[in-house]
Every structure is written in structure tokens, then in C-alpha cells.
Amino acid sequence: MSPRKRDRSWPPADAVVPLAAPVTDNHTHLPVPADAGGPGSEAPLTAAELVECAAAVGVTRVVTSACEVTTWEESLTLARELPGVRVALAVHPNEAVLHAGVRETGPDGLEPRAQEHHGEPLDSVMVRLEETLRANADVVVAVGESGLDFFRTGEKGAAAQREAFRAHIALAKELDLPLQIHDRDAHTACVEVLEADGAPERTVLHCFSGGAELATACAEHGWYASIAGPLTYPANTALREAVAALPDDLLLVETDAPYLPPRRWRGRPNASYLLGDTVRFLAEQRGMGEESLCRRLQATTAAVYGTW
């Protein structure tokens, strides 16, 4: 008998019961033609379909992160065409490495996959990022995601990431925008850079993955922790303990779709319409009613990103 094939299809649109009150997915990646591939690409759903499914279950607003230069313009178009959509723009730390001309193999063992657009130097890309942010203030609500990813890069790449991270911090402060931070295997280094340069007033640790030490830093500095599907994974006891120690008013929720779905959908594409599983898990963990948590999350989202 052949091994059972894992189901990689999209979870059904009615997989999650509608939430008791509206919430915002403050970090997702809506599909655009320039970024084809990844989970769900075999039978893709359009951005419009994903937004419609999300709204039907109470996820009424989303912030889509466009962190490769090839996705900026198409993501801005989505925000102007689809209800409830806004954009965060940045150069992802792993993209920054390629724009800096670094081609070293990182700790993950994967060879870097440079494409034609990576020939544009990092300093030129950062100039273009600032221009794009300024020109699209009507639909841009954050700078992100930027930060450090030591899982995917070596020593030379880490230097390029730090340079880019510091440039994003300065840009977010200059434009008075929130900063969404990508932090993978780099908790201490991220905190050191933020403390050295001075973090933006609204700093969000996207897909929070830290332990007690990072939670303490967030609480001390007033940085926001954005909670995603990994909170629900059985092995992540330290993550749950860290999140439990954070105050309610520093919590946001996200999917980071199409990656990292909540536990019962692991191995399948993630989407904003599945966010309810994470919200309900978080409510149970904190001993809060679902509606109360939703309203608290929405108020915090408004404090960080404004309303739309």
C-alpha cells in the first residue's frame, strides 16, 4: 500500500466559526502575480477571495506585508481595490542580503537564489522604498517586515541585515510609521539594535517567537507582540509562557499567511479566515471571553495602525 498523501489543499472557507467581534490580521501576505508559488499555489485562491472569506468570519481588516521590491506595486493596488486591506512595505532581511551582493550559504544549508531584481544595490532599494512609502501614504500603514534572520544567513549576510534593519528603523521614525520586525533566531541581536538606535514609538515583533527574556523586553519598552499560529503548537510551551506574561494592551494577532497555520491546519496553506483558531486559543490561555479579547485586540490594532 502506498503511503497516505498529505492534504495540502486550502482549508474550507467555513472551517472556523465566525468570531464574536471583528479583529484585524495585522500581518499576512496576500498573493500577487509577482510572488507566485508557496503554500496553496497548486490551486490558488485570489486575494479577493481570501479577503472575502476572512470578512465572512469576522476578520474584517488585514495588513499585507510586501517585503520584496517586485511585490510593492501589486500589493498597493490590492489595497486600493479590496475592502479592508492596507499595506506594510519593506525589504525583507533575507532580501537585503541578496541586494547587498552577498551569496554565502547560511546555517540552513540552502544556496542563495538571486534573481535579476537583486542586482539593484541595497542603498538604491532603500531610497526607492522611502519614495514609495511617501507616495502611497493613503494605503501604507507600516514599514515591514524588516529585522534579522540568522537562520538563513551567515556572517556576511548578518552584517547586511543589520545595515538594512537600522535603515528601516530610521525610516519608520522619520515617517512616523509602525515598524514590523522579522526576528528569527536573532532575539538578542534584534533587541540590541533597537535599544542602540532607539525603536520607533510603535514597534511590533511580528510572529512573536521569543521566550521570557524577549517578553520582558517588550513589556519594558512598550513593544507589541503579534501572536500567530505557532502559539497553538503543542511543543511551544516556552512561547505560551512568554505570551502569558505580556500585558493585554501589547498583544496583536496575525496569520503570516500563507505560512504557519494554527495547529489543526498544519501542513496546509494558511489564510486570514483561519485566524479565529489563534484568537480563541489566546482567549482561553488568558482566561478572557472571546468577545472581550476581540475588542481589546481591535483597540490595540487601532492604536498601532489607525483605522480604515
Annotated model-derived regions:
Residues M1-W308:
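Mid-domain alpha/beta scaffold segments of enzyme catalytic cores
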